[in-house]
Structure formats: structure tokens, C-alpha cells
UniProtKB/Swiss-Prot annotation:
The gene is nuoH. This is NADH-quinone oxidoreductase subunit H. GO terms for biological process: aerobic respiration. The chain crosses the membrane at residues 4-24, 44-64, 78-98, 120-140, 165-185, 194-214, 255-275, 279-299, 312-332. NCBIfam families: PRK06076.1-2 (NF004741).
Length: 332
């Protein structure tokens, strides 16, 4: 087999594996969230369908597939129909440039667990994952529902504001490492525990985590939906499979965000003592992913004015200060 044919086959297989694994993980994440929230609230959670309630995932899938797909008569039907697909596609495309595990050898060839190792991977991931919000905005706008439009508008303002916070935090990382490549950022942290960038950039870590909660529409910083204020926000008019596709995209973005935090700040897939790198990657990403559930259970939903004041009066000044300190450190 020629090198080009092997490369094409390898890329195709990687894409299929990533879509299959992360679509399955998105479903498992809904089960995990229900179980974790139940534990926090001293409830049992799903436990009736299958062992430990695991088959509840299949029951939920059947329910979504068989529900009536309703499109409001006064909506922008085409945009309303494709908005969930935009969310899922952008979430999966962002995974293409994220290195998941250490490279390994198969059939005498070195395999990198990444679809495309590009030298501007960080820009690619942030750009494509940021496009997911267009699905939320377009879906809410096309629904012709006041709650959906309010949710889309609130989300638009918050995303634009907090992307500045996340970008300033990432610029500090890029200044230290000197590269946009996620592989280079991972390798920069290969000298041991204290080479992890969380110790060199603790403020950037906190700022990026907060921005990530906004990007993935997670409580307590989610403005796009709120049961007490705007019902389900942008998703008020969605039902059945389209609603499910929206949430596959959302949970895939959450998983991608947890992996990205691990690569940027927590040593990536480098081995730790006698623990292999792939195990470290799974453990650290799972720990970050757990934070989504913990924050939802522990903190109340913030008001829109509180979220925006925190951004412009606290987080952006801190991000600029962190950037200046990092620049001085690099120069000196």
C-alpha cells in the first residue's frame, strides 16, 4: 500500500472512530450527569432500566427518535432545521486537531491519535468550537419565539464578551511555549509534574475555565436558557431528534473542552511516574469534566448583569494584567 493510500485510509478510520466514540461518550455523559446530580441531592437517579440504570440511555434514544419532529409554522424553517446540525458538526470538527493520546506503532507504522496535526491547532480548535454558538443563535432566532430570541440574544452577548477572556488567557500560554501547536504545548510539559502550565499560569487556568463554562452553556454562567426566566431559551421550540442533536453537540463540546484544558494546563498525555500517558489523559480529562456537574449542583444561576459585570470589571482586567506579567517574564 502506498503512503498516500495508507494516509487516506488512516485518516478515514480516525474520523469514524472519533465520531463513534464521542457520540457515545456524549450519551454516557447525560447518564453520568443525572447520577452525579442525584448524588449531590441525595437522590438515586436512573436505576430502573438495566443494571445501575445504564440502559436508560437506550430508552432515552428511542424516545427521542420516536417523538414527533415539530417545526413551528411561523419559523424560518430551513435555518430552524439545520441549526442542530451546525452545533454537532462544529463540535466534531474541532476534535480533528486535538491530540488525544500518545503516539503508538501499528503494523510497523507510527500512528498519531490525531486527525490533523497542524501548526495552528489551537487557533483551529478555538475557532471551530466557537462556531457552535452560531447554531444556538440561529436556532433561537429562527424559532420565532420570544423566549428563544431572548436566549439567543443573551448568549450572543456573553459569548462575545467571554471569548476575549479565553483568548487573553491562551495568548499567555502561547507566549510561554512559543507555538500554536497542541502537540508542542503538550511536549513543553513533559519534564515532570512541576512543568505543568497550571503552575506557571494559574490565573490563565482559572480564566480559561470560566470562559469554557460560558462557551459550553453550563450553569452557573449559562445565559442562553433558564427555566425560571426564559424557559429553555433557544431550545424552547425544539423537540425529538433535533433537540437530541443539539445536546450531542453541547456534550461533545464539553468533552473537547475538558481534553483541551488537560492539554493546555495539566500535562496532557505525558506519563506520570509509572502511570502511562493514556491513563493520565483519561483521568485528568474526566476530573475536569466532573467540574461541569459539580458546578451545576453547587452554585446558583447568576443573573445576566452579574455575569457581564464579572467579565468587564474583573476578568478582562485580570487577563490583561496576567498577559503583561507573562510578557515581562518572557522578556526578562
Amino acid at each position: 500500500m502506498s503512503d498516500f493510500a495508507f494516509f487516506a485510509l488512516e485518516t478515514l478510520i480516525k474520523c469514524i472512530i472519533i465520531i463513534a466514540i464521542f457520540a457515545s461518550l456524549a450519551g454516557l455523559a447525560t447518564y453520568a450527569e443525572r447520577k452525579v446530580l442525584a448524588y449531590f441531592q441525595r437522590r438515586i437517579g436512573p436505576d430502573m432500566v438495566g443494571p445501575f440504570g445504564l440502559i436508560q440511555l437506550v430508552a432515552d434514544m428511542i424516545k427521542l427518535f420516536t417523538k414527533e419532529d415539530i417545526i413551528p409554522s411561523n419559523s424560518q424553517k430551513f435555518i430552524f432545521a439545520i441549526a442542530p446540525l451546525i452545533s454537532a458538526i462544529c463540535a466534531f470538527v474541532s476534535l480533528a486537531a486535538i491530540p488525544m493520546l500518545p503516539e503508538f506503532t501499528l503494523f510497523g507504522r507510527v500512528i498519531q491519535p490525531i486527525v490533523a496535526d497542524i501548526n495552528v491547532a489551537l487557533l483551529f480548535v478555538i475557532g471551530t468550537s466557537g462556531l457552535c454558538f452560531y447554531a444556538v443563535f440561529l436556532g433561537g432566532l429562527a424559532s420565532n419565539n420570544k423566549w428563544s430570541i431572548l436566549g439567543a440574544a443573551r448568549g450572543l452577548v456573553s459569548i462575545i464578551s467571554y471569548e476575549s477572556v479565553g483568548a487573553l488567557a491562551l495568548i499567555a500560554i502561547i507566549m510561554l511555549v512559543g507555538s500554536f501547536s497542541l502537540v508542542d504545548i503538550n511536549n513543553y510539559q513533559s519534564d515532570g509534574f512541576f512543568s505543568w502550565l497550571i503552575f506557571k499560569q494559574p490565573l490563565a487556568f482559572v480564566l480559561f475555565i470560566i470562559a469554557l463554562f460560558i462557551e459550553t452553556n453550563r450553569t452557573p454562567l449559562c445565559l442562553t436558557e433558564n427555566d425560571a426566566e426564559i424557559v429553555a431559551g433557544y431550545g424552547t421550540e425544539y423537540s425529538g431528534l433535533r433537540w437530541g442533536i443539539f445536546f450531542i453537540g453541547e456534550y461533545t463540546s464539553m468533552i473537547a473542552g475538558a481534553i483541551l484544558v488537560t492539554l493546555l494546563f495539566l500535562g496532557g498525555f505525558n506519563s506520570f511516574w509509572i502511570i502511562p500517558g493514556w491513563i493520565m489523559m483519561i483521568v485528568k480529562s474526566s476530573f475536569i469534566f466532573f467540574w461541569y456537574f459539580w458546578a451545576r449542583a453547587a452554585f446558583p444561576q447568576l443573573r445576566p448583569d452579574q455575569v457581564m459585570k464579572m467579565c468587564y470589571l474583573i476578568l478582562i482586567p485580570l487577563a490583561v494584567l496576567n498577559l503583561l506579567i507573562t510578557a515581562l517574564t518572557v522578556l526578562l
